[in-house]
Amino acid sequence: MADAEDIQPLVCDNGTGMVKAGFAGDDAPRAVFPSIVGRPRHTGVMVGMGQKDAYVGDEAQSKRGILTLKYPIEHGIVSNWDDMEKIWHHTFYNELRVAPEEHPILLTEAPLNPKANREKMTQIMFETFSVPAMYVAIQAVLSLYASGRTTGIVLDSGDGVSHTVPIYEGYALPHAILRLDLAGRDLTDSLMKILTERGYSFTTSAEREIVRDIKEKLAYVALDYEQELETAKSSSSVEKSYELPDGQVITIGAERFRCPEVMFQPSLIGMEAPGIHETTYNSIMKCDVDIRKDLYGNIVLSGGSTMFPGIADRMSKEITALAPSSMKIKVVAPPERKYSVWIGGSILASLSTFQQMWISRAEYEESGPAIVHRKCF
């Protein structure tokens, strides 16, 4: 009998901003690295430096000063398959150090992912990486699994896209899924703009990463935006300083909550779209009247862009204002929500009942990539 680790399924959550990968049954991903592929902007002049024509993940991040960084996943959906293949190759061989042909693999996808994309994903796994079996699961559904529920509405907001996905007894309700093309990357861009207005210049793809760090460390969601703006004007209680890589120290005040406020008021960056609270409410209203109560009572936050302090309280306040007055509203923000999609995948792939759900190599060879629509829903 082969060692259990040999046949342990792999779980790979490919986000717009970060790849989370590891082994089914683990309680956290082993590898978390940026979904970026970097190519040198200059020609190498030093022989024997071992320069590569492309760098992936952390290595691309650390050499960002001399590279052009590209994200192969935009708004949660793969747009550049060659680069995506590089990322998967890096995941298996360099990060997890496994042979993909020996492990079943569970991949994740954005809700409302185009059919052609799922097929392409399936094809690459079987043909390029020769996996023995694979499955594609919807990200938000996995987050709900991770929270120990089978019914609820998930607001999943990552780097590239936000979704509200109502799930009843384990089934996503596709007619009520809403997508909002506003997420972490837009918040970073908006913060870059705000800081530029204040005279700091952040323009390159490398400098954007600095701003992302400022956002992750210092931003928070105000319970009452207007009131918070008044407080920021009259006192320095919200000011914090941040040291840039070159030693320069910048002070940021109202920007700390102006940046994530965009999620509740997309009009702040000129987007004509409802905020995350309204999107969640609209999703619930598209569901059958009999299940709304269960959804209002199980609003689950998931993804890196729900990590801002204060977001759950604000969400609760905003939805309470929209919902019927007698409705009991509960917003759940699990502490591990940054990785809850991955954790849900880890749980799912290790269930004994899941083992008949895998798409096997034989099934793929018989039916081709379209098999994914029949087996994964």
From Swiss-Prot:
Compartments, record wording: Cytoplasm, Cytoskeleton
Pfam families the UniProt entry points to: Actin
Protein name (Swiss-Prot/TrEMBL): Actin-2
Chief location category: cytoplasm
Family assignment from sequence similarity: Belongs to the actin family.
Cellular component, GO annotation: cytoplasm; cytoskeleton
Function recorded in the entry: Actins are highly conserved proteins that are involved in various types of cell motility and are ubiquitously expressed in all eukaryotic cells.
Keywords: ATP-binding, Cytoplasm, Cytoskeleton, Hydrolase, Nucleotide-binding
Reactions that this protein is recorded to catalyse: ATP + H2O = ADP + phosphate + H(+)
Organism superkingdom: Eukaryota
Note: There are at least eight actin genes in rice.
Lineage, broadest ranks: Eukaryota, Viridiplantae, Streptophyta, Embryophyta, Tracheophyta
Gene Ontology MF term list: ATP binding; hydrolase activity
EC number(s) stated in the UniProt entry for this protein: 3.6.4.-
InterPro entries the record matches: Actin, Actin/actin-like_CS, Actin_CS, ATPase_NBD
Stored PROSITE patterns: ACTINS_1, ACTINS_2, ACTINS_ACT_LIKE
